[in-house]
């Protein structure tokens, strides 16, 4: 590991963010810090993750949602201070890393099937 990677790893550890495992196709709820005047509150932005870029401290992800019939996309830096929390609402089955094709689709063709993991979780044993 060179010096730049080492410094970046230290910064990511110092950020202390609890980032769940998610990928393109998953529906995520992002808690965004919004400042209104002198008070700060958390505003949730829920939508489908259509892209994810893993570049250390420069990692980001794009979330797309439909708001009053209009598509809204937002790019969130993963380690930005405005991102308060990330929650995975549901997992989706997709065969692409980038889902930009969803921009041109509406209705049923824009739906993503839910991924069901049949593997046992860490705490429970598999039935044999």
Curated annotation (Swiss-Prot):
It holds the Pfam family Ribosomal_L19. This is Large ribosomal subunit protein bL19. One of its GO terms (biological process) is translation. The gene is rplS. The keyword Ribonucleoprotein applies. Disulfide bonds: none annotated. GO terms for cellular component: cytosolic large ribosomal subunit. InterPro entries: Ribosomal_bL19, Ribosomal_bL19_CS, Ribosomal_bL19_sf, Translation_prot_SH3-like_sf.
